[in-house]
Design a protein with these regions (language model features):
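Symmetry-related core transmembrane helices of the 12-TM Major Facilitator Superfamily/SLC fold
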Residues: 1-14
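Helix-loop junctions on the cytosolic side of multi-pass membrane transporters
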Residues: 15-26
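An amphipathic, aromatic/His-enriched active-site/gating alpha helix that lines ligand/cofactor pockets
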Residues: 23, 74-84, 101-137
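Non-transmembrane accessory domains of multi-pass membrane transporters/channels
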Residues: 31-76
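Short, well-ordered beta-strand segments in beta-rich or mixed alpha/beta enzyme
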Residues: 48-56, 85-114
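Short, highly charged
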Residues: 61-90, 94-100
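A short beta-turn/loop motif at secondary-structure boundaries
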Residues: 87-93, 129-130, 143-144
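Long, low-complexity, Ser/Thr/Gly/Pro-rich intrinsically disordered segments that act as flexible linkers
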Residues: 137-145
Length: 145
């Protein structure tokens, strides 16, 4: 019992010393995200859904891009994404595809609703590496029924 009490006291002191909200740039306000409009008549509970984004990156920026993508990985996983990965196209150098899976179409829409301003800042840093006039190509793949 004494050990538990000591642990609680030390935990309380630690929380006061190292607060999670000390980052002055941390902005957890929700960000407006445009929801994709499916061309298929899809039920919200249909899934799983594989989401992918295709980026065109200069080879000289590949290493820095992958470092930024680790922050994007945390955003996707925090939002409920699993099986996150980035692949490089061996037939078209400079094409990188980010991919992750969510349980259903509704889960992905909810993921977008939880997108914060901090998430948007990370996404903007990642997209700064993208070397095309259009935004990265997004694909939403659902398992056939």
């Amino acid at each position: 019992l004494c050990v538990a009490t000591l642990g609680m006291v030390l935990g309380s002191v630690t929380v006061l010393r190292w607060r999670l909200d000390q980052d002055p740039d941390l902005n957890l306000d929700l960000s407006d995200v445009t929801e994709p409009i499916p061309a298929l008549d899809i039920h919200h509970d249909r899934g799983p859904v594989r989401v992918s984004y295709e980026y065109r990156i200069q080879q000289s920026d590949a290493r820095a891009f992958m470092i930024c993508m680790q922050d994007m990985r945390r955003v996707r996983r925090r939002g409920g994404g699993s099986n996150w990965a980035v692949y490089e196209d061996i037939l078209q150098p400079g094409i990188f595809v980010e991919t992750f899976v969510v349980g259903s179409w509704m889960e992905h829409l909810r993921q977008l609703e939880r997108y914060t301003m901090n998430d948007r800042k990370i996404q903007t840093r990642v997209q700064a590496f993208h070397q095309a006039e259009q935004m990265p190509i997004a694909r939403y793949l659902v398992a056939p029924e």
